[in-house]
Amino acid sequence: MSFLDYFLGSRKKSANVAKDRLKLILAHERDADGPDFLPALQEELLAVIAKYIPVDKENIKVSMERRGDFEVLELNVLFPDQH
């Protein structure tokens, strides 16, 4: 390995590391914003569920996350006890 190859080779490695870090930062910022439609979706789901079961708005949580190549929409509903 020559003197120039040593320095040129390290630049490629550091460039790849910087590129990977930038991808992580951009992905994190993209996820932090969240989809704009989630509040409206939560309201509509509450209206549909309320037709059949009385449930409070605070008991419905809608979230979206990325898992690999997929985006997963998660819906958690806490139903009231039926005594």
From Swiss-Prot:
Protein name stated in the entry: Cell division topological specificity factor
Domain of life: Bacteria
Glycosyltransferase found in the keyword field: no
GO biological process: cell division; regulation of division septum assembly
Family per similarity comment: Belongs to the MinE family.
Keyword annotations: Cell cycle, Cell division
Organism this protein belongs to: Acidithiobacillus ferrooxidans (strain ATCC 23270 / DSM 14882 / CIP 104768 / NCIMB 8455) (Ferrobacillus ferrooxidans (strain ATCC 23270))
Pfam families with a match to the protein in the record: MinE
Keyword Cell division: yes
Function field: Prevents the cell division inhibition by proteins MinC and MinD at internal division sites while permitting inhibition at polar sites. This ensures cell division at the proper site by restricting the formation of a division septum at the midpoint of the long axis of the cell.
NCBIfam families: minE, PRK00296.1, PRK13989.1
Residue stretches spanning the membrane: none
